[in-house]
């Protein structure tokens, strides 16, 4: 038995249809094959055609087309069968209709089939396949709707980086603006789609284009509380912009879309690798060429943020790149933990001041770490649906936290050993008859004797003064 599937088909970008009572029964998907029992009148055939489209009954659609129904038939509010199929991301139906001669460039009041496909409420994989089919039939990626929004803006707004890349590879303009002055980059920043922002920057998006109210994409991101994207757009250098903009269509498709050879042939462009934290940091500084080097040396972002300049040089990072990294660390106020260099344990002349300084620094840094974790706990949202930015799998965070707990336990154990060792040394030193106290110790002892003597004398003097007053009153 086929399960019901609820879905609404609306015009892209929130544009409503001209007629609310259009006769479409959208939302029930029944893949049970149905066949015509005989010739039907024209009106009844059109009604059956609509039901076949809404239920996704491809065999019935083909049979009706064979019976003489035009593939470009317009229904009550002006949509064609191809437009509806694109609105629900039905790849097989789109392919059948195109093969039967459906017009991929059709539009209703400037609402094109391609815009409808890019604004569909399906998975990115299905949307990508529908868009690829339409582009292969010469659909224009730069035709805008009544709000002057182009297909790439809808794809960016809905968070589809692969669709954005495919549209640009077929000639879509990256920096066009809609009626409010929004570009595709502005839409991605507004909605908090980090991967789309990165992809658009690579494709030549201009982050300085302002909306009609004078806001840049970074300001739009900040206003909508997408602080990670705000920082990314603020730090991103011009070397990242337009990285692939001058490539040919074939080169763009090859570089921007990664396919999975283990899947079926019709599952084109089904795999996309998102940027990790390290890649995001490097891309933001225009140092994406360092990605392979750091990964080869197994240097994580956490490790990179704590490396000193000499360590950067040892790992093959040039002086110019070192300056960019150090400047970014300073701008981000990343405090480098400096514990100082302890003398070798083998030496007997261990400086007490230096050792005490190390312990004080260690204690201070532990306090900073505790405060940082407490701050993170208070800032994290309680419910998962409140998380706006794209996160990796929670298992990754859990595993790191487990490792942190283990490291903290190891640290506690080692500090206890250090404490016991120091206590043992102190006891042996106090019980050693041959021990000669240092000058500081002698001086301290003498000062203590003098203080006690002075206090004693003052006490006797005060007592005599009280006794004298008492005697005089009597």
Swiss-Prot record:
Location(s) in or outside the cell: Cytoplasm
Residue positions where Phosphoserine is found in the record: 16-17, 19
GO biological process: cell differentiation; male meiotic nuclear division; regulatory ncRNA-mediated gene silencing; spermatogenesis; transposable element silencing
Domain SAM: 271-333
Keyword NAD tagged: no
Primary role: Plays a central role during spermatogenesis by repressing transposable elements and preventing their mobilization, which is essential for the germline integrity. Acts via the piRNA metabolic process, which mediates the repression of transposable elements during meiosis by forming complexes composed of piRNAs and Piwi proteins and governs the methylation and subsequent repression of transposons. Its association with pi-bodies suggests a participation in the primary piRNAs metabolic process.
Name of this chain's protein: Ankyrin repeat, SAM and basic leucine zipper domain-containing protein 1
Gene: ASZ1
């Amino acid at each position: 038995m086929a399960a019901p599937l609820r879905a609404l088909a609306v015009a892209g970008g929130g544009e409503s249809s001209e007629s609310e009572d259009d006769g479409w029964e959208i939302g029930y998907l029944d893949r049970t094959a149905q066949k015509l029992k005989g010739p039907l009148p024209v009106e009844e055939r059109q009604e059956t055609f609509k039901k076949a489209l809404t239920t996704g009954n491809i065999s019935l659609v083909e049979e009706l087309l064979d019976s003489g129904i035009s593939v470009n038939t317009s229904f009550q509010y002006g949509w064609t069968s191809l437009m509806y199929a694109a609105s629900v991301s039905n790849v097989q139906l789109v392919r059948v209709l195109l093969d039967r001669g459906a017009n991929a460039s059709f539009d209703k009041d400037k609402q094109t089939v391609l815009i409808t496909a890019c604004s569909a409420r399906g998975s990115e994989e299905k949307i990508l396949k529908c868009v690829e089919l339409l582009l292969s039939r010469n659909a224009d990626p730069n035709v805008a709707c009544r709000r002057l929004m182009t297909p790439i803006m809808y794809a960016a707004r809905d968070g589809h980086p692969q669709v954005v890349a495919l549209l640009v590879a077929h000639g879509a303009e990256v920096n066009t603006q809609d009626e409010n002055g929004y570009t595709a980059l502005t839409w991605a920043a507004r909605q908090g789609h980090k991967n789309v922002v990165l992809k658009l920057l690579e494709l030549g998006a201009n982050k300085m284009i302002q909306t009609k109210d004078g806001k840049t994409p970074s300001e739009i991101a900040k206003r909508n509380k997408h602080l990670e994207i705000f920082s990314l757009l603020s730090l991103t250098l011009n070397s990242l912009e337009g990285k692939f903009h001058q490539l040919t269509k074939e080169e763009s498709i090859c570089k921007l879309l990664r396919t999975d050879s283990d899947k079926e042939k019709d599952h084109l462009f089904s795999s996309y690798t998102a940027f990790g934290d390290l890649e995001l940091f490097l891309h933001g500084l225009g140092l994406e060429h360092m990605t392979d080097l750091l990964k080869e040396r197994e240097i994580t972002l956490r490790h990179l943020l704590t490396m000193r300049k000499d360590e950067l040089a040892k790992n093959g990072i040039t002086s110019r790149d070192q300056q960019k990294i150090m400047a970014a660390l300073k701008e981000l106020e990343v405090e480098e933990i400096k514990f100082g260099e302890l003398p070798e344990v083998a030496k007997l002349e261990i400086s007490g001041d230096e050792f005490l300084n190390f312990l004080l620094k260690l204690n201070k840094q532990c306090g900073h770490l505790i405060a940082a974790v407490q701050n993170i706990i208070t800032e994290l949202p309680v419910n998962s649906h409140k998380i706006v930015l794209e996160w990796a799998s929670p298992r990754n965070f859990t595993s790191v936290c487990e490792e942190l707990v283990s490291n903290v336990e190891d640290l506690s154990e080692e500090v206890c050993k250090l404490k016991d060792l120091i206590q043992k040394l102190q006891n042996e030193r106090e019980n050693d008859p041959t021990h000669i106290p240092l000058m500081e110790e002698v001086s301290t002892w003498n000062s203590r004797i003098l203080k006690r003597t002075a206090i004693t004398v003052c006490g006797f003097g005060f007592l005599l003064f009280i006794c004298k007053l008492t005697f005089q009153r009597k």
